[in-house]
Each structure stands twice: as structure tokens, then as C-alpha cells.
């Protein structure tokens, strides 16, 4: 899956992964990340999610990373925000109070960019990637995060043979495999969500689960 794929999805407004509401799992479980006002949270492959503004409204410093320039521009335009724009190590950096978005390749992210980061929130990053990229993504994320970190991860699982992703099925054992090295993993929620996901129903998917994990290292 190449960068051109995601640029085309945004250019053609094929963004079914974008939610027009704050993610309810985030609202329910943000407190489990034990963040204090002013601490930084990373949102990888963030798109233009409404969760960015909501997290900032909770008093957090939000750092999003997104490949698509259109997604980043749309986020600020739709929130009537006027960011300062400059360059940072190959990224185009957009900044307003409480929110910094780095537009560019996630795999160019370096540990020094996350030196102040306390936690991450992944709702649509891991499940957006095919298997060969998921392992690379999870490895890079762990390499650049500070040693002591927490994470809130949302995944879906379904019979992958019944539908081509994205979003892709990421079963529980895969999550635990990616984060086996020094992370404590707690499943916070798991439920059947097939009935409220028409895209999966239309394609004949027989079951669909959504799960939420708390990850902690250090």
C-alpha cells in the first residue's frame, strides 16, 4: 500500500473511515492514560479526526501525524483555525494553540519529535495498514515513543477473507504479538458492532468485533 493510495482516497473523498463524531471509546477511556493538563498525546495517521480538537479541549497538547496534506488542511479549515506553518525535518508542521500536526511520512518520525510525549491514541492507524505494514508501523511507533508510555488502541476483527481492507482485521493475538516486548496489555472493551456498520453488512461479512486496549510500558 503506497502513499498514492491514501492521497487518492482523500482527493476523491473516499474517507469512510472518518467519523463525524468524537469517538465514544476515547471519551470513556481517556482517563486511563493518566494525563495531566499540558501533557502531550500522539495521534498517528490522524486524518482530520474530530478527536484532535476534543483532546485539545481537555487541556492536552496534541501531536498528530498525517500523510495527506488535504486532510490536514481540511481539519484546520473545518475548525476555522489558522495555523502557523513551517518545516521540521522533512515534515510540514502546522501549529495552533494545543494542536500540532506534522504532515508527512509517519516512518520519518524520530524519537526527538516525541521527547515530550506521554501517550498515544490509535483509532484508525493500525487497522488502516495491511499485514506487512502493520508490523513495521508498530515497531516504529515503539522505537520512537519514550520508554515510559501509555496507549489507547482501537481495533476491529472480522473474517478477512470476506472483505478486502482497509480497514483491516487485526485479531487479539496480533495486537499482543506486536506489543509483546515490555508492554502491559489490558483489553478494556470488546463488542459485536456488525449491526451498525452498513459497509460490512453490504459486503456479506458474517461477524465484526471492535476492541479497545490500554497499553503501558515502563
Swiss-Prot record:
Protein name as it appears in the record: Thiopurine S-methyltransferase
Lineage: superkingdom: Bacteria
GO biological process: methylation; response to metal ion
Pfam families named among the record's database cross-references: TPMT
One function term, GO molecular function aspect: thiopurine S-methyltransferase activity
Native source organism of the sequence: Pseudomonas aeruginosa (strain ATCC 15692 / DSM 22644 / CIP 104116 / JCM 14847 / LMG 12228 / 1C / PRS 101 / PAO1)
Alphabetic keyword roster: Cytoplasm, Methyltransferase, S-adenosyl-L-methionine, Transferase
Catalytic activity: S-adenosyl-L-methionine + a thiopurine = S-adenosyl-L-homocysteine + a thiopurine S-methylether
Gene from which this protein is expressed: tpm
UniProt: S-adenosyl-L-methionine binding residues: 10, 45, 66, 123
Stored InterPro entries: SAM-dependent_MTases_sf, Thiopur_S-MeTfrase_Se/Te_detox, Thiopurine_S-MeTrfase, TPMT
NCBIfam families: PRK13255.1, TMPT_Se_Te
EC main group: transferase
Main location: cytoplasm
Subcellular location: Cytoplasm
Amino acid at each position: 500500500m503506497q502513499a498514492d493510495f491514501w492521497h487518492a482516497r482523500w482527493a476523491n473523498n473516499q474517507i469512510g473511515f472518518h467519523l463525524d463524531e468524537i469517538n465514544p471509546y476515547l471519551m470513556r477511556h481517556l482517563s486511563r492514560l493518566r494525563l495531566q493538563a499540558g501533557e502531550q498525546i500522539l495521534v498517528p495517521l490522524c486524518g482530520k479526526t474530530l478527536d484532535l480538537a476534543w483532546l485539545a479541549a481537555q487541556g492536552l497538547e496534541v501531536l498528530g501525524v498525517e500523510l495527506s496534506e488535504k486532510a490536514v488542511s481540511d481539519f484546520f479549515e473545518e475548525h476555522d483555525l489558522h495555523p502557523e506553518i513551517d518545516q521540521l525535518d522533512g515534515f510540514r508542521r502546522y501549529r495552533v494553540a494545543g494542536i500540532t500536526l506534522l504532515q508527512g511520512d509517519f516512518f520519518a518520525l524520530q524519537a526527538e519529535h516525541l521527547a515530550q510525549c506521554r501517550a498515544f491514541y490509535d483509532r484508525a492507524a493500525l487497522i488502516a495498514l495491511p499485514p506487512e505494514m502493520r508490523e513495521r508501523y508498530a515497531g516504529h511507533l515503539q522505537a520512537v515513543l519514550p520508554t515510559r508510555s501509555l496507549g489507547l488502541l482501537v481495533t476491529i476483527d472480522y473474517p478477512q477473507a470476506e472483505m478486502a481492507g482497509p480497514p483491516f482485521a487485526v485479531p487479539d493475538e496480533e495486537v499482543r504479538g506486536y506489543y509483546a516486548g515490555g508492554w502491559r496489555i489490558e483489553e478494556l472493551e470488546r463488542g459485536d458492532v456488525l449491526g451498525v456498520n452498513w459497509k460490512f453488512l453490504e459486503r456479506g461479512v458474517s461477524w465484526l468485533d471492535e476492541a479497545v486496549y490500554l497499553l503501558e510500558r515502563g
